[in-house]
Curated annotation (Swiss-Prot):
Intrachain S-S bonds: none
Species assigned in the record: Rattus norvegicus
Name this polypeptide is given: PILR alpha-associated neural protein
Signal peptide: 1-27
GO cellular component, one term: basolateral plasma membrane
Localization: Membrane
Record carries keyword Membrane: yes
UniProt keyword ATP-binding, yes or no: no
Cytoplasmic side: 196-272
GO MF annotations in UniProt: protein domain specific binding
Designated gene of the protein: Pianp
Principal location listed in the UniProt entry: membrane
Post-translational modification: O-glycosylation at Thr-136 is essential for recognition by PILRA.
Residue spans of biased composition, Polar residues class: 209-225
InterPro entries the UniProt entry points to: AJAP1_PANP_C, PIANP
Length: 272
């Protein structure tokens, strides 16, 4: 019984099993046709020492019909465009931010205005100020002179004058001279203050050294004996206590006659 039940359950699943088999068959129909097989190897001739295989070269792959926009064919009768390829619609700002678009140039013979065709640039007959006051034409102008050797010589443009040595009537701001004068005065005053400070400091250093030298000289000239009205005392070697001199010592026998002896004062003894 169970095989019959199993077959009855598997019968509805047969279409699902046939579905994957039909998909590869449909996909194979869309594939490109297989490449032609190469011809077999043929013998070149009876005189050839060995078999030579001649193969036919396959044709090169066909290129896509797409052509880049920048590459355009130029007909033999037409002139190439004035602007570079790819710039007909204007230079892109993201790809070439540093590109400069030059305008057309018109010569004087054609009757064009050189100032209008070259905006932002100096005119062709622009003159420079010369040191002696004359106007020097531009080297590219028609007023150039020709020397005997056939060389075209033009006067070189004069360099700009320094503003400090030029005339005051040439449009220099007078405030500039006032600023320079005040700056010079400030520098001179600051230099004088610094010099005065250094001089006072050097004098203060010399005074203490002079005083110390005077004190040392006085100490060297001071005598070893001390002259006093009471008597002459000699400074001892081991102390400052005065020692009586032999001239003021009393005689051994006693006081001299005629000398008043103080009351209550004991007699001076030699052997203390």
């Amino acid at each position: 019984m169970w095989p019959a039940q199993l077959l009855s359950q598997l019968l509805p699943l047969w279409p699902l099993l046939l579905l994957p088999l039909s998909l590869p068959a449909q996909g194979s129909s869309h594939r490109s046709p297989p490449a032609p097989a190469r011809p077999p190897c043929v013998r070149g001739g009876p005189s050839a020492p060995r078999h030579v295989c001649v193969w036919e070269r396959a044709p090169p792959p066909s290129r896509s019909p797409r052509v880049p926009r920048s590459r355009r064919q130029v007909l033999p009768g037409t002139a190439p465009p004035a602007t570079p390829s790819g710039f007909e619609e204007g230079p892109p700002s993201s790809q070439y931010p540093w590109a400069i678009v030059w305008g057309p140039t018109v010569s004087r013979e054609d009757g064009g205005d050189p100032n209008s065709v070259n905006p932002g640039f100096l005119p062709l007959d622009y003159g420079f100020a010369a040191p002696h006051g004359l106007a020097t034409p531009h080297p590219n102008s028609d007023s150039m002179r020709d020397d005997g050797d056939g060389l075209i010589l033009g006067e070189t443009p004069a360099t700009l004058r320094p503003f400090l040595f030029g005339g005051r009537g040439e449009g220099v701001d007078p405030q500039l001279y006032v600023t320079i004068t005040i700056s010079i005065i400030i520098v001179l005053v600051a230099t004088g203050i610094i010099f005065k400070f250094c001089w006072d400091r050097s004098q203060k250093r010399r005074r203490p050294s002079g005083q110390q030298g005077a004190l040392r000289q006085e100490e060297s000239q001071q005598p070893l004996t001390d002259l006093s009205p009471a008597g002459v005392t000699v400074l001892g070697a081991f102390g400052d206590s005065p020692t009586p001199t032999p001239d003021h010592e009393e005689p051994r026998g006693g006081p001299r006659p005629g000398m008043p002896q103080p009351k209550g004062a004991p007699a001076f003894q030699l052997n203390r």
